[in-house]
Design a protein with these regions (language model features):
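Short glycine/serine/threonine-rich phosphate/pyrophosphate-binding segments
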Residues: 58-62, 143-147, 168-170, 192-194
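Adenosine-phosphate binding glycine-rich loop
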Residues: 153-217
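General beta-strand structural signal in soluble alpha/beta enzymes
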Residues: 4-9, 75-78, 120-122, 136-137, ...
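Glycine-rich phosphate/diphosphate-binding loop of Rossmann-like nucleotide-binding domains
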Residues: 12, 21-24, 28-131
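Alpha-helix capping and helix-loop boundary segments enriched in small/acidic/polar residues
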Residues: 17-21, 25, 53, 126, ...
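Generic hydrophobic/aromatic pocket-lining and core-packing "Φ" positions
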Residues: 34, 63, 148-149, 173
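Rossmann-fold NAD(P) dinucleotide-binding segment
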Residues: 120-134, 142-159
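N-terminal ligand-binding/catalytic initiation module
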Residues: 1-20
């Protein structure tokens, strides 16, 4: 047995010493990363259309920050299929409903379509849709395999931003990185903000203080 060493837990609830914005941090950071990628090409998030997978903490954070910066998530997928909302997941009503929906049943996103009268495609993923500007896989590992990667390449969409942990199979990622029209951002860089805010959480704990949302962000 080695020497005893002090450790720390992160991702705690705010009431037990956690940091404000920790649940949203990975999603917010992914959008900030995307903003820098777009800036390099002389573009911005205003008017941007996003197709993504997932609506957990990370996915919800993406939806919220994209909305705040003037873009919109027009497609999002869950385990049971995908949603197409041409107006985007925008505004408090829709964003709050996402929170309620996943709390009641995280395996089904169809209730969103029922609530807001938009399209739901059962048993499919949204990779390959053409009327968006960026794809952001933010759910499970290996979400995008070679079959979906080919659809993504054929769509002509110019940006593929990995947000989840290893959301793309190795062969699919290699294939996507070969596409000259496609800018690919790897997950280890894109989702680093979650870990960064964990560090900020421990810094707050060490000082026995809480930072405001503005200070954390």
């Amino acid at each position: 047995v080695g020497a005893a060493e002090f450790g720390a837990m992160s991702g705690k609830a705010v009431c037990t010493g956690g940091s404000i914005l920790r649940p949203e941090a990975t999603g917010f950071g992914a959008v900030y990363y995307l903003r820098e990628v777009l800036k390099h090409d002389g573009k911005g998030i205003e008017g941007l259309r996003v197709a993504m997978s997932g609506y957990g903490n990370v996915g919800w954070g993406i939806m919220k920050k994209i909305d705040e910066l003037g873009g919109k998530v027009t497609y999002f997928a869950g385990p049971d299929g995908y949603i197409h909302d041409p107006d985007g997941v925008c505004g408090e009503e829709k964003l709050n409903f996402i929170l309620e929906m996943r709390a009641k049943d995280p395996m089904h996103c169809k209730p969103y379509a029922d609530k807001f009268g938009v399209d739901f495609v059962e048993g499919q993923k949204c990779w390959g849709v053409k009327d968006v500007d960026v794809y952001m896989p933010a759910a499970t590992q290996n979400d995008v395999n070679m079959e979906w990667a080919k659809k993504i390449a054929e769509s002509g969409v110019p940006y593929y931003i990995e947000v989840g942990n290893m959301p793309t199979t190795n062969d699919a990622l290699a294939f996507l990185m070969e596409q000259k029209h496609l800018t690919v951002a790897p997950s280890k860089a894109v989702n680093a903000c979650g870990v960064s805010v964990s560090e900020l959480e421990m810094a707050q704990n060490a000082q026995r203080i809480y930072w405001t949302a503005e200070e954390v962000e």
